[in-house]
Amino acid sequence: MALLTLVLVLAATFAAYRYFFHPLRRIPGPLLAKFTDAQRFLDTAGGRAELTHRLLHAKYGPVVRIGPNTVSLSDPECIKLIYSNKANFPKSDFYAVNDVTQGGQRVCTLFGTRDNAFHAKLRAPIQKYYKVSELLKLEHRVDRVIEDFCGKLEERFVKPGKPCDIAEWFLFYAWDAISDVTFSKPIKEGFLNKGGDIDDLLTTAEQALDYFAAVGQVPILDEVLDKNPVKRIGPPSFQAAADFCVKKLIARTTGAETNDTANQDYLDHFLAIKQASDPADGVSDATVVGWMLLNILAGADTTATTLTAILYYLLKHPDCYKRLQHELDAARLPRPVPYGDAVRCEYLDAVVREALRVHPGVGLLLERVVPEEGLAVPRGARNGEDVFLPPGTVVGMNAWVVNNDKGVFGPDAEVFRPERWLRGDGEGVEGYEERIKRMKDVMLSFGAGRRVCLGRELSLFEIYKVVPMIVGAFDFELVDQKKEWELTNSWFVRVKSVDVRIKPRMLPN
């Protein structure tokens, strides 16, 4: 009885501190968020946390307390304060859930490390290979995957007249494309060729993301689940993908598999970096495998999701679809479509940017930790006064909130309207350029600053090349125009059930 009384007294004292004395006590937000992360955990596990974040900011304003020590911000002005190259805000322990264990030791990944200096060291040797100038050397690899993709759509859906879940097939395309540029071959027989999952990789990826997103809201849970030293209780591992990467590494280093020096892939680049590095740099075989895994596990989902969003919104807005078709027809682009030609298509560019804006790939907070000097959030309070967040506060912004800011994107920010990226009637050149720059600066679809997505240009490269190919070759229509797609937010906002009919398209003379 005495023990129970002690526990209740301690719990009451702890709750009283968080309600009356915690440094964040004056930050508005749900009542439960003052005491526990449970609501945050359950909401994220439900798979649509981005909607909750929008509602919370609509109700409470630009600064919202969503957990005892976690604050969500929505003012675009905060982007440069938290995420710029000059800002020294490390990632939070949310990302620690992404760590792996090797030999009982925790190993941080390029994506998950909370050490900005370590991240810069790990990223520096490889980042140049993700620039457009280097991607152009890989263009023929993406071309052959696109040709295979179009061929499979023709064979499996156009000729037999069967409906196609295009979200699923965009995922197959994205995985095969990233596999080809990484190690010159698809994984096993290839997702497009099989027309389905391989070794449960796609299923495993979904389950791992479900775990990462939810458990990351209460990172201490990961210590007793996935990182449990006695018995691991976590999502399925990516062992099949890791094994494939290891086999490719061994085959390439032993000479069992060779690659033309004039036709290099990412594995060639990674091995060259390892060979040229000083042993003190710590670039090992495990580092190379980690780089390969980062490519294939992080490089496919966002590409596939964006492609699905592009087609879905075009089919929901027939006028936009027709306008894009007319632009591409008039451009008379060669087949396969060169990247340099595609990015010069003005309306195509507007469509891609708008799809990324209304459906960013990541749907949770990009969490950071406030450094020792604290953070003054300008005009964060309802009365327009600044709000001070003390050191150690977990703070972040959600692209699904920021990308819909009406002050930046207009009063119709929640509407898919590619024309907002074009110069308006009567709009001066200088005003247009300033407006576009402002929108680009605020877009958080790929993150921002020093931790911006490494593969951003690679993803866009694959997107800009495939969209004009399929829009030019086929006519798409939704099987049910009234049906909404299925979304699940588990870090990446993945898409399912976008059923379309595909017909061959007769190009105008």
Please state what every model-predicted region is.
Residues 2-108, 112-121, 140-152, 173, ...:
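N-terminal membrane-proximal hinge/A-helix region immediately C-terminal to the signal-anchor transmembrane segment
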Residues 11, 491-509:
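C-terminal helix/juxtamembrane-tail motif
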Residues 28, 151, 187, 318-321, ...:
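Cytochrome P450 heme-binding "Cys pocket" and the immediately downstream C-terminal segment
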Residues 32, 143, 197-204, 261-264, ...:
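Cytochrome P450 I-helix active-site segment
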Residues 91-103, 137-307, 323:
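Cytochrome P450 heme-thiolate monooxygenase catalytic core
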Residues 159, 252-269, 325-345, 358-387, ...:
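Cytochrome P450 fold signature focused on the C-terminal beta-domain
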Residues 302-315, 466:
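Short, small-residue alpha-helix embedded
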Residues 397-433:
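Conserved cytochrome P450 K-helix/beta-meander segment immediately N-terminal to the heme-binding cysteine loop
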